[in-house]
Regions:
Chain A
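Aromatic- and glycine-rich beta-strand/loop motifs that create alpha-glucan
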Residues: 1-25
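Hydrophobic alpha-helical transmembrane segments in multi-pass membrane proteins
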Residues: 22-27, 64, 68, 101-118, ...
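Secretory targeting signals
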Residues: 35-37, 53-56, 62, 96-160
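Membrane-embedded or membrane-proximal helical elements that form or frame transporter/channel pores
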Residues: 37-78
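Terminal transmembrane helical anchor/hairpin motif
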Residues: 39-53, 162-165, 169-239
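Short alpha-helical transmembrane interface motifs in multi-pass membrane proteins
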Residues: 67-72, 97, 101, 129-134, ...
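Hydrophobic/aromatic residues in alpha-helical transmembrane segments
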Residues: 67-74, 147-148, 223, 227-228
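Helix-loop-helix units of permease transmembrane domains in multi-pass membrane transporters
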Residues: 74-103
Length: 239, 303
């Protein structure tokens, strides 16, 4: 088994053994369920419209959930930090291991958040495709939050400060469309497209699997993971 | 089994290493070498620089100046493969409290590229069999320390670095740790405050004071001769070459490029030849190395 897969298995096992995974899934399922009931479902709306609103706002929740997962994984691993720093493994293997564990937890979180949306489907409204596309959009938003959280914690000494830094970056990206209105037209399109959920979850929330949006979100995630690996390698030498 | 270090090379070379935390010096121009198989104790009071030096050797801290080589590798090199030849137990053992002892050691063995039986072997070696299935978070301090040592040796390293391995252990646990360390066939560098234990484990002692190496002596120096340290001149024949010319290849031991162990009877001739070649003699030591001498260095109290 490769080092990254071994680390991923350990981290996922740790999430399970400490109860953090179940607390995460329960909280996420509850928050998303309440969100659907409170904001999305309205008797004047069609089921498609309700699901679209649910999957749009829920994507922001998934980004936050990814950040929380990153913070949890880093805090859990801190006491044994010296283990990887003295082991013959590279920083990117450790980051990949943590990311894989977090991505699996994010995937489970998406499934745990689908219970009320599935009830909509079970009642004869909406479609399986809409739920799948919305779930994919959520997953991509979640792993982006996770990767940005890992990047922040890799660069800063305190995990909480790192997760907050990752969150600030995410918020800054999501606010880009507001900045876009105030800049020259040449930059406007670029800045508008930088917002992960605002600009790249639109197709998913409407039940369409858009490959270009998936590529953008995965590309941003990959860039964050590369940054995390660089930061982690530098931390190997930190006092 | 990890690959051996290059033949004849010292297991550890520390050459002019300094380390500063902001403007505060933790190590100042420390130089020494450790031969393969040697057991060396790093002594000094709190804040003397022991932990900083061990962290630099373990490759988790970079020196502000100077050069380090350990197990045939420069710790700063990008390829981390050399770490398979190193075992390190820091002051706080790097443990995952949520895992069982056996699962944790299997995990560490796999990360360090050891064979499948390594975890079972080290569990028996460290007498952890009765606790193998227990969660690490539920173990006493003594057993946590033992698991920490097990993770450092699970992959059978060539060089083992231990930072206060006996801290907080009761007498029985300390004796068990000593027996275990005496049974290991590797190069050992450990820091400890327990002078009586150090005297039983180590064959050589390095004393740090305010970041400087102030004493370097061995348990058998009186029998084996004297230790000579040289500041080489920029030109002319190297110190090593002069020693070969004066006493022959078999009558001295090169600890590193600048430190040699020579027979007591040769010291006058060697010193004359080195000075004539322009080299500076930094130290010529023939200490006795006993527990009483260690206690004399540090006074009644442990360092």
């Amino acid at each position: 088994m490769s080092a990254a897969r071994r680390i991923a298995a350990r981290e996922l096992g740790a999430l399970h053994r400490t109860g953090a995974l179940w607390a995460f899934l329960g909280t996420l399922g509850l928050v998303q369920g309440l969100h659907l009931l409170a904001f999305a479902v309205d008797e004047r709306r069609t089921s498609e419209r309700a699901l679209a609103i649910f999957f749009h706002h829920g994507a922001y929740v998934m980004e936050a959930a990814g950040l929380v997962l990153a913070l949890t994984l880093v805090v859990m691993g801190t006491p044994a930090d010296m283990l990887w720093r003295t082991a013959p493994i590279r920083a990117h293997q450790r980051i990949a291991g943590r990311f894989i564990a977090g991505a699996v937890a994010t995937g489970l979180g998406v499934l745990a958040s689908m219970h009320l949306a599935a009830l909509v489907l079970w009642s004869g409204y909406g479609s399986v495709g809409h739920l799948v596309a919305g779930g994919v959009g959520w997953f991509l938003a979640g792993v982006l939050g996770l990767a940005l959280g890992l990047a922040g914690t890799a660069f800063l000494r305190r995990p909480l400060a790192g997760a907050i830094a990752g969150g600030c970056l995410l918020v800054a990206l999501e606010l880009m469309p507001m900045v876009a209105d105030r800049v020259r037209p040449g930059w406007r399109a670029v800045l508008t497209e930088a917002a992960p959920v605002w600009a790249h979850n639109d197709a998913f929330r409407r039940g369409i699997l858009d490959l270009s949006d998936a590529v953008f979100l995965l590309g941003l995630t990959y860039a964050a993971l590369v940054a995390a690996s660089v930061g982690q390698e530098d931390r190997r030498w930190a006092p | 089994m990890p690959p051996p270090s290059p033949d004849g090379a010292p297991a550890i070379v520390v050459a002019g290493v300094s380390r500063f935390y902001a403007a505060q010096p933790a190590l100042r121009g420390v130089s020494f070498g450790v031969a393969p198989g040697e057991r060396v104790a790093l002594l000094g009071r709190n804040g003397a620089g022991k932990t900083t030096l061990l962290r630099i050797l373990a490759g988790v801290l970079d020196p502000s100046a100077g050069r380090v080589q350990i197990a045939g590798a420069d710790p700063s090199e990008p390829d981390p493969g050399w770490r398979a030849r190193l075992g390190f137990l820091p002051e706080q053992p790097p443990l995952h409290d949520d895992m069982s002892v056996a699962a944790y050691l299997e995990y560490v063995a796999e990360l360090r590229g050891a064979d499948a039986a390594a975890a079972e072997r080290v569990i028996a070696q460290c007498e952890l069999g009765s606790h193998a299935g227990r969660r690490i978070g539920t173990l006493s301090h003594g057993f946590r320390q033992r698991v920490g040592l097990a993770q450092a040796i699970v992959h059978q390293p060539q060089v083992l670095l231990l930072d206060e391995p006996a801290a907080g252990l009761d007498p029985a646990q300390t004796a068990a740790l000593r027996t275990l360390l005496q049974s290991l066939e590797l190069t050992l560098l450990l820091s400890s405050h327990l002078l009586s234990e150090v005297a039983r484990i180590a064959t050589r002692y390095l004393v740090l004071e305010e970041g400087r190496l102030v004493r370097d002596f061995g348990a058998s120096d009186e029998q084996e001769g004297v230790r000579l340290r040289v500041e080489p001149a920029s030109g002319g024949p190297a110190p090593h070459r002069i020693l070969v010319d004066v006493v022959g290849t078999t009558s001295f031991e090169a600890i590193d490029e600048c430190t040699f162990r020579i027979a007591t009877g040769d010291r006058a001739a060697v010193c004359r030849a080195l000075i004539a070649a322009g080299h500076e003699l930094v130290a010529l030591e023939r200490p006795t190395s006993t527990l009483s001498e260690l206690e004399a260095i540090f006074g009644e109290a442990a360092p």
